[in-house]
Amino acid sequence: MILIEDLTVVSQREIAPRIFEMVLKGEMVADMQLGQFVHLKVPDPSKLLRRPISISEIDYNKKEATIVYRVEREGTAILSKMVAGQTIDTMGPQGNGFDISIIEAGQKALLVGGGIGVPPLVETAKQLKAKGVEVVSVIGFANKNAVILEDKLRACGDVYVTTDDGSYGIKGYVSTVIDNFDWTPDAVYSCGAPGMLKYVDSKFENHPHAYVSMEARMACGMGACYACVVHVKGETDAKNLRVCEEGPVFPTGKVIV
């Protein structure tokens, strides 16, 4: 069920240049699932459209959820100035999220993230670990300064970090690491830039439990405006799915990334 609630800002901090981590508190948290997102209304009357931001962590006991976002334009810049005690008009939780019911204790999951696509993998990793699943994360960034959330993922399993320029971790891309694995994961969960998702979609196209979480510009966020559609593969007629409703998570091989 999609709700609208004024969530309270518990804390906010900059964890990397232009990347902020905000903790929100409210009753809505009880309905949140890993891989979903919230739609935030910027506290400025001139900003009409909400901002979709993925949920990074969920603490059901405290009724707190953590989001991580990058300051891109004026709207997110305004969000970055919010402080503890302020409230923000929030619609959510939205989207289908990651399905971890298909993997069992003792099996192995591969998490693949790039840049600001890494945050939703944190709660996924935590819940997989709690389930007894072996978690391996491969995360890619432009450079050392852009690396985020490595410590939280490392608390859940092995982590490989790549940077485009080699300033931290392994020089290259997530594919540089994954293509050298001599094992096949029982499930794959990914979120990141289109180029990275194209790689995951191709690499694991025929995998029965591989998923890509897609980003898209949204307007209404409720499936009515069709501003966030993606195209279904193999359809002769134009068939679209909405990232905000049928997504943001899709099985590999399902949609054109």
From Swiss-Prot:
Binding site for [2Fe-2S] cluster: C220, C225, C228, C244
FAD-binding FR-type domain mapped to chain residues: 2-100
Cofactor note: Binds 1 [2Fe-2S] cluster per subunit. Binds 1 FAD per subunit.
InterPro entries: Cyt_c3_hydrogenase_gsu (IPR012165), Dihydroorotate_DH_ele_sf (IPR037117), Dihydroorotate_DH_Fe-S-bd (IPR019480), Dihydroorotate_DHASE_ETsu (IPR023455), FAD-bd_FR_type (IPR017927), FNR_nucleotide-bd (IPR039261), PyrK_electron_transfer (IPR050353), Riboflavin_synthase-like_b-brl (IPR017938)
Residues annotated for FAD binding in this entry: R51, P52, I53, S54, V68, Y69, R70, G75, T76
GO molecular function: 2 iron, 2 sulfur cluster binding; electron transfer activity; flavin adenine dinucleotide binding; metal ion binding; oxidoreductase activity
Classification via PROSITE patterns: FAD_FR
Keyword Electron transport (UniProt): yes
Cell division found in the keyword field: no
UniProt keyword list: 2Fe-2S, Electron transport, FAD, Flavoprotein, Iron, Iron-sulfur, Metal-binding, Pyrimidine biosynthesis, Transport
UniProt cofactor(s): [2Fe-2S] cluster; FAD
Biological process, per Gene Ontology: 'de novo' UMP biosynthetic process
Pathway: Pyrimidine metabolism; UMP biosynthesis via de novo pathway; orotate from (S)-dihydroorotate (NAD(+) route): step 1/1
Subunit structure: Heterotetramer of 2 PyrK and 2 PyrD type B subunits.
Function description: Responsible for channeling the electrons from the oxidation of dihydroorotate from the FMN redox center in the PyrD type B subunit to the ultimate electron acceptor NAD(+).
NCBIfam families on file: PRK00054.1-2
UniProt record similarity statement: Belongs to the PyrK family.
Protein name per Swiss-Prot or TrEMBL: Dihydroorotate dehydrogenase B (NAD(+)), electron transfer subunit
Organism phylogeny: Bacteria, Bacillati, Bacillota, Bacilli, Lactobacillales
Gene that encodes the chain: pyrK
